[in-house]
């Protein structure tokens, strides 16, 4: 919950960046749909940036078209619009709630750097793990 995550992240970021934290801009990597993105990151980004004095980029990246799932022939990636001028010259802290391989974070790093930003770090609060299903073995 936000009540637990925001103080934990605030402490982590203050210990890591100290007095430089207010020079950073928080960029949450958008969810696959506008509705999910707003539900996941709008309140979170406001709370975290209020606690840390970072700038909040939430309103500067819009989900223009929701992602089409891969199993339906889509890319699984939403179409986004970036307020390009906003990112030029900024120092970015990327945030993804759950990371699997890091591809989204790498893609966003490259996109923001192409817009003139410098990505300082990326942070996540969870990692996807895949566990094998309980398999039945036949004894020989």
Please describe what each predicted stretch is.
Residues 48-68:
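Histidine/lysine/aspartate-rich catalytic loop segments that bind and position anionic ligands
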Residues 1-24, 61-91, 101, 126-130:
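Active-site-facing substrate-recognition patch
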Residues 21-33:
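Short glycine-rich phosphate-binding loop at a beta-alpha junction
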Residues 34-38, 101-102:
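Loop/helix-junction capping segments adjacent to catalytic residues or to phosphate/diphosphate-binding pockets
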Residues 38-42, 46:
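Short, surface-exposed alpha-helical segments at coil->helix boundaries
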Residues 106-140:
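PRPP-dependent phosphoribosyltransferase catalytic core
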């Amino acid at each position: 919950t936000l009540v637990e995550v925001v103080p934990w992240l605030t402490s982590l970021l203050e210990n890591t960046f100290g007095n430089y934290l207010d020079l950073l801009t928080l960029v949450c990597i958008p969810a696959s749909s506008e509705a999910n993105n707003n539900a996941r990151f709008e309140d979170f980004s406001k709370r975290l940036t209020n606690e840390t004095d970072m700038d909040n980029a939430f309103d500067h990246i819009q989900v223009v078209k929701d992602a089409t799932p891969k199993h339906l022939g889509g890319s699984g990636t939403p179409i986004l619009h970036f307020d390009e001028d906003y990112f030029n010259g900024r120092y970015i802290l990327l945030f993804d709630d759950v990371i699997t391989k890091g591809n989204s974070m790498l893609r966003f790093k490259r996109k923001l750097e192409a817009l003139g930003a410098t990505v300082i770090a990326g942070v996540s609060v969870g990692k996807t793990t895949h566990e094998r299903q309980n398999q039945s073995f036949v004894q020989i």
